[in-house]
Each structure stands twice: as structure tokens, then as C-alpha cells.
């Protein structure tokens, strides 16, 4: 039952994060859809770590280096997702209020992605690797 509660909590967190992103785009005072480009970063952020977990064996000495490279690449994607709205706001493509809403949405979405890997990352019967 704890897995179902975690899944519902993660779904709620994702919905709240996407709501902040949409508010930063669709409110009549902002009315610019440039911040939707951060959706690409949401999709790209878990990919390096997922690939590293599938390819490496924990007994190998190279596995630690491969996982650290994956975490480094994931960090670059996350920092880019936080930097893009700021660059858009500095270039006057979006308003600073929209930037704040998008950054709030980024925080919630990336916390949800981290929570997913913490909840479903173990190698038990309720693991995401079975999907």
C-alpha cells in the first residue's frame, strides 16, 4: 500500500509542477510560450542515469565512474533547465514573474523526478526496472 501512496504523491507533485509551468506561460499578463522548452529538459534529465544503471555491473570498477558521469550529465541538464528561463527573462522574451513561476515548476518537477528514483530505485519487487 505504501507504493500506491508514493505513486499518487508523485503524480500530484508532477501535476503541481506542470501547473506552475503552464501558469508561467498562459496567464494573460505573460502570454508567452517560450518557457515550454524546459519540457525537453524534463524528458532528458533521467536518461543518463537510466542508461548507466542498465549498462554497468556493480562489481566492476568502471561502474562507479560511469554512474558519476551519468550524474554529472544529469546535473548539466538540470542546471540548464533552471538557466533557460533566466536567460529568456534577461533577453526580455518572458517577464520575470513568468520566470519565477517556471523556476518554481522546475523545482517541483525535479523534486518529483528525484522522488521517483528514490522510491522506485531499489531492487525489490516494486522497482521501476520492471517497467
Curated annotation (Swiss-Prot):
GO molecular function, one term: identical protein binding
Subcellular location: Membrane
Pfam families reported in the protein's UniProt record: Vps55 (PF04133)
Transmembrane portions of the chain: 7-27, 32-52, 69-89, 100-120
InterPro entries cross-referenced by the UniProt entry: Vps55/LEPROT
Recorded GO CC terms: endosome; membrane
Membrane association type: Multi-pass membrane protein
Gene Ontology biological process terms, A to Z: late endosome to vacuole transport via multivesicular body sorting pathway; negative regulation of growth hormone receptor signaling pathway
Keywords per UniProt: Membrane, Transmembrane, Transmembrane helix
Self-association and partners: Interacts with RAB13.
Family note: Belongs to the OB-RGRP/VPS55 family.
Cited function: Negatively regulates growth hormone (GH) receptor cell surface expression in liver. May play a role in liver resistance to GH during periods of reduced nutrient availability.
Name the UniProt record assigns to this protein: Leptin receptor overlapping transcript-like 1
Organism of this sequence: Rattus norvegicus (Rat)
